[in-house]
From Swiss-Prot:
S1 motif domain ranges (all copies): 623-691
Domain of life: Bacteria
Protein name per UniProt: Polyribonucleotide nucleotidyltransferase
Cellular component terms (Gene Ontology): cytosol
Keyword Thylakoid: no
Entry EC no(s): 2.7.7.8
Primary location group: cytoplasm
Originating species: Bacillus mycoides (strain KBAB4)
Domain KH residue range list: 554-613
């Protein structure tokens, strides 16, 4: 292989994509620098020389953001990047999922794929560059990877599909679809959409796959030019004699145990068989390696039998039909002091979702590589160990929890009211209380119930369902509402969320090489039937969002002021706005266009704050009449407060109709008097007159007297 830098280029969505090899990170097994527009991502792949003594494939994928990529210096005291952002974690998962199925069963060498984002052009996706770079780094390396794969982002504008849309195009698009796969089939889908029909989503997936084929052909050319010969590795295999002996000892009893319908009873029955076999080999003083192989064989017996029952006999572990959904139960308003709550139960999967409404100042501030600076809608997913009857340390959210939370967020965001119609920050927290598969979709259903209970005026309710697939040769079975065992031992986890009108989110992970269009189409249609069944159940519990918000939710008043007056409301160093907040206990958020949001639980305090702000921004107009209060008396006149923060001077000559010798003869401090604005000078000083109003009143009285005289004269005639 040549050690000189080599450059390969292709056009991708009207922008140049360039791959540079053999210059950077040469000690990694494989490394490429991907340039897409002005985006630059360094992707590397490294593998251990020897297999690890573990019973799984130790693959780690890292998508590393560097703030220098967008010309930022990290905040905080340390001034360096800390833990990965949510976006970086989701990007790592996005790359991991299509790559993982393409390593051989039994491969136990540790593999680490790292993509460092070094420069960002917002119109050229760094995630797509990293996915391509990760695939290519593995493909040109000596690591036995059965790729390459590629990914593409698909948008839809005015009914037309667009590959890798720009930021401006994304704002106009009614879907954001990421699809990845090999040249033969799709193996990963991640999508958010604005209630798009299933048929359209399928067309978008296939449209993206056409672009994937082109990118894979491009990668194959690069591999042909600079790729290393793949290392021959020994795959993990169990001893053939041991395999036969264990199967003879355990298969019959294990097959019976698998068909126990209830989850915990089934797990106990399987454990009894496993324990008996392992104790037999422990009694024979088998070493750790042999005992590990025995566990592996027992696992394979379970997997093979579950798959055979589903594909051949069409029997699921819990006795359901392929398209049957577990029993449903829902409840709302179960937590009195929260703003909204929804409990959703599907079989032995249960999620309790809580909705909290906050002011717009409660938005989440984003400090990453994207153009978004904040978001007003959040969905957080928690998966405590007690939900599966286990014990483990309680730590912060892992990649899985962050991924499931983001999926729910993506599914629900399209049906949220606009900020103009509902000026609240919305936070959802989904607590998984029981788990037997499909918890992410249960959290979506629970969150819909919680928002409806909270009075959030959703455009439409959303439900989610997880589909599964078990494929053996030409035989396959698509499963509706998969449980934990079917997810773990099956070939697909296909989550579909949406309304009665269409899809709002998709997520698909495949453990086999990929799926055909026909299977995808069948899965989508079967998911729609299941989703509608769940939606109907949810609507029987709460048919529409509550009209009134919770008494414990903040009340928000919206008002508009002249943008030039924003500085007056805020005051020097925030002095004025902080004074209002301290006096009323409200939260105040001001937009650049002059929109003001005032929020608190106490509506009376909201109104008080609004009145204060109205007085601050109110402008004095020549000719207007005010009832003001005398604040100060001088020899030359009286200063009158027209409203909060606005004073004017009534000169001594303008106090009365007659000549006034002393101001105190007419008014004193604290008196309320009516005055008229007669002038605002160049310095902004307001000159007032009481005399003008007295004269006008005198003239009105004179006019009344004259009219009365004329009326009397007419009567006498």
């Amino acid at each position: 292989m040549s050690q000189e830098k080599q450059v390969f280029s292709i056009d991708l969505a009207g922008r140049q994509l360039t791959i540079e090899t053999s210059q950077l990170a040469k000690q990694a097994n494989g490394a490429v620098l991907v340039r897409y527009g002005d985006t630059a991502v360094l992707s590397t792949a490294t593998a251990s020389k020897e297999p690890k003594n573990v019973d799984f494939f130790p693959l780690t994928v890292n998508y590393e953001e560097r703030l220098y990529a967008v010309g930022k210096i990290p905040g905080g005291f340390i001034k360096r990047e800390g833990r990965p952002s949510e976006k970086a974690i989701l990007a790592s998962r996005l790359i991991d999922r299509p790559i993982r199925p393409l390593f051989a069963d039994g491969f136990r060498n540790e593999v680490q794929v790292v993509s460092i984002v070094m420069s960002v052009d917002q119109d050229c996706s760094s995630e797509m560059a990293a996915m391509l770079g990760s695939s290519l780094a593995l493909s040109i390396s000596d690591i036995p990877f059965e790729g390459p794969i590629a990914g593409a982002t698909v948008g839809r504008i005015n009914g037309e599909f667009v590959i890798n849309p720009t930021v401006e195009q994304q704002e106009q698009s009614d879907m954001h679809l990421v699809v990845a796969g090999t040249k033969d089939a799709i193996n990963m889908v991640e999508a958010g959409a604005d209630q798009v029909p299933e048929e359209t989503m399928l067309e978008a997936i296939m449209f993206g796959h056409d672009e994937i084929k082109r990118l894979i052909a491009f990668q194959e050319e690069i591999v042909q030019a600079v790729g290393k010969e793949k290392t021959a590795v020994k795959l993990y295999e169990v001893d053939a004699d041991l395999n036969q002996a264990v199967r003879e000892m355990a298969e019959t009893d294990m097959h019976s145990a698998i068909q126990v319908h209830e989850k915990h009873a089934r797990e106990d029955a399987i454990s009894v068989v496993k324990k008996r076999v392992i104790e037999h080999y422990e009694a024979e003083e088998a070493d750790a390696d042999t005992l590990g192989q025995v566990s592996e064989i027992l696992y394979k017996i379970v997997k093979e039998e579950v798959r055979r029952l589903i594909t051949v006999e069409k029997i699921r572990p819990d006795g359901r039909k392929g398209d049957e959904i577990r029993p449903l139960a829902s409840e709302v308003g179960i937590l009195s002091r929260t703003h909204g709550s929804g409990l959703f139960t599907r079989g032995q999967t249960q999620a309790l979702s809580i909705c909290t409404l906050g002011a717009l100042g409660d938005v989440q501030i984003l400090d990453g590589l994207g153009v978004e600076e904040s978001k007003r809608f959040m969905h957080h997913y928690n998966f405590p160990s007690f939900s599966v009857g286990e014990t483990r340390p309680m730590r912060g959210p892992g990649r899985r929890e962050i991924g499931h939370g983001a999926l729910g967020e993506r599914a629900l965001e399209p049906v949220l009211p606009s900020e103009k119609d509902f000026p609240y920050t919305v936070r959802l927290v989904s607590e998984v209380l029981e788990s037997n598969g499909s918890t992410s979709q249960a959290s979506i259903c629970g969150s819909t119930l919680a928002m409806m209970d909270a009075g959030v005026p959703l455009k439409a309710p959303v439900a989610g369902i997880a589909m599964g697939l078990v494929k053996s040769g030409e035989h396959y079975t698509i499963l509706t509402d998969i449980q934990g065992m079917e997810d773990h031992l099956g070939d697909m986890d296909f989550k579909v969320a949406g309304t009665a009108k269409g899809v709002t989110a998709l997520q698909m992970d495949i453990k086999i090489d990929g799926l055909s269009r026909e299977i995808l189409e069948e899965a989508l249609q079967q998911a729609k039937v299941g989703r509608m069944h769940i939606l109907n159940h949810m609507l029987s519990v709460i048919a529409e969002p509550r009209i009134e918000l919770s008494a414990y939710a903040p009340k928000i008043i919206t008002m508009a002021i002249n943008p030039d007056k924003i500085r007056d409301v805020i005051g020097p160093s925030g002095k004025q706005i902080n004074k209002i907040i301290e006096e009323t206990g409200v939260k105040i958020d001001i937009e650049q266009d002059g929109t003001v949001f005032i929020s608190s639980i106490n509506q009376e305090m909201n109104e008080k704050a609004k009145k204060i702000i109205e007085d601050i921004v109110r402008e004095v107009q020549v000719g207007e009449i005010y009832l003001g209060k005398v604040k100060r008396v001088e020899k030359f006149g009286a200063f009158v407060e027209l409203f909060s923060g606005k004073d004017g001077l009534v000169h001594i000559s303008e106090l009365a109709l007659e000549r006034v010798g002393k101001v105190e003869d007419v008014v004193k401090i604290g008196d309320e008097i009516s005055v008229k604005v007669i002038e605002i000078d160049k310095q902004g000083r307001v000159n007032l007159s009481r005399k003008v109003l007295l004269k006008e009143e005198q003239e009105k009285e004179a006019a009344k007297e004259e009219a009365a005289k004329e009326e009397n004269a007419q009567e006498q005639q």
